[in-house]
Curated annotation (Swiss-Prot):
It is found in: Nucleus. This is Histone chaperone ASF1B. The gene is ASF1B. Belongs to the ASF1 family. Its main location: nucleus. GO terms for biological process: cell division; chromatin organization; DNA-mediated transformation; double-strand break repair via homologous recombination; mitotic cell size control checkpoint signaling; regulation of cell size; trichome branching. It comes from Arabidopsis thaliana (Mouse-ear cress). It holds the Pfam family ASF1_hist_chap. Interacts with histone H3 and histone H4. Interacts strongly with the N-terminus of TOUSLED. The keyword Transcription applies.
Amino acid sequence: MSSINITNVTVLDNPAPFVNPFQFEISYECLTSLKDDLEWKLIYVGSAEDETYDQVLESVLVGPVNVGNYRFVLQADSPDPLKIREEDIIGVTVLLLTCSYMDQEFIRVGYYVNNDYDDEQLREEPPTKVLIDKVQRNILTDKPRVTKFPINFHPENEQTLGDGPAPTEPFADSVVNGEAPVFLEQPQKLQEIEQFDDSDVNGEAIALLDQPQNLQET
């Protein structure tokens, strides 16, 4: 059983201009206290054929991780268009929200993102060079792809078992080519996080979220 469960993800400011920051309101529950922080990442897939074009837009550490229910807003800059091939800017790509504990990724939420011009004439007659300030992104929030990976949340309890736990396989295929995302070396520590009791989660607090998304595992 996982020690951390995502209970809700709300995509804010969507649709939005391509250059606007991403904003995700994330609610999750912690079933057992953890010694280390959780690491949340937002990854933009720049090319379906070449993962070297993936961009880690944000990586933050969230803690302490005590038993309870939590909610925070993850904000990330838009991807750098100069690091995306011109032919890959317009069209459909993937955005990945991941969470890891002690360098072990245990959940990944994938969204399709459609980038297109907000002007009908530009859509019908696209310019040779992409006009990035005219591009609008639309995150398709109705059917996020959720993948869970079994990990050891309490390795300190198995220090006497010799070599430790065997490598684990994911419950479902990755959203993108079955590959793990690129990790940042020095993630930032996120300070603003809200904890609320069970009555909030079961009652009004969750109801206040705009356009809550039901996360269905695949």
